[in-house]
UniProtKB/Swiss-Prot annotation:
NCBIfam families: IPP_isom_1 (TIGR02150), PRK03759.1 (NF002995). Its cofactor is Mg(2+); Mn(2+). Belongs to the IPP isomerase type 1 family. It is found in: Cytoplasm. GO terms for biological process: dimethylallyl diphosphate biosynthetic process; isoprenoid biosynthetic process. This is Isopentenyl-diphosphate Delta-isomerase. Mn(2+) binds at residues 27, 34, 71, 118, 120. The active site is at 69, 120. The keyword Magnesium applies.
């Protein structure tokens, strides 16, 4: 059986939806602006979950990144998409009530080593979870709970080892937190 076609929501420059495109073909050298999300998970000790993208990923394979990210389907809320991707990517649950919208206006454009462009309007969420992780090997090569300040230092020292969206999001999350020493940035 053929898996269902996954589509992304295309956006105008002002963020208004203007259509959809097949996810398998939309990421190219001229990727249009589309809707996505990022989610940063924390444990009860205030550590942040970072994941290393599986080597089979089309863009930025093998780099360390945020806990998980994805694209909502047309008509799917960001919160519903986050719950879906938490299960698909990490084998865990994220309670919609535990989600906090941390960076509502985050947007970026980046080009990977193969020339493929990411061009996303990408609200950033955080959540604290207490559930076990069972990551999908198709999505995640490795994962680690990290001290937020140590991660921020690592990203600053070796940005090439991390996804471009993490290198942009993490300092913004840290700044928005009021420089909290632990817990959710």
């Amino acid at each position: 059986m053929t898996p269902p076609r996954e589509e992304v929501v295309l956006l105008a420059e002002d963020g208004a939806p203007i259509g959809t495109a097949d996810k398998a073909t939309v990421h190219s050298e001229s990727t249009p602006l589309h809707l996505a999300f990022s989610c940063h998970l924390f444990d009860g000790d205030g550590r942040i979950l970072v994941t290393r993208r599986a080597l089979g990923k089309a863009t930025w394979p093998g780099v360390w990144t945020n806990s998980f990210c994805g694209h909502p389907a047309l008509g799917e809320s960001l919160e519903e998409a986050i719950a879906r991707r938490a299960h698909e990517e990490l084998g865990t649950s994220v309670d919609a009530l535990a989600l906090a919208l941390a960076l509502p206006d985050f947007r970026y454009r980046a080009v990977d080593a193969t020339g493929v462009v990411e061009h996303e309007m990408c609200p950033v969420y955080t959540a604290t979870i207490a559930w076990e992780l069972r990551p999908s090997a198709d999505e995640v090569a490795e994962w680690e709970w990290a001290d937020p300040r140590a991660l921020l230092s690592s990203v600053a020292a070796t940005p090439w080892a991390f996804s471009p969206w993490l290198t942009l999001q993490l300092p913004a999350l840290y700044a928005a937190s009021g420089d909290q020493p632990s817990g959710q940035l």
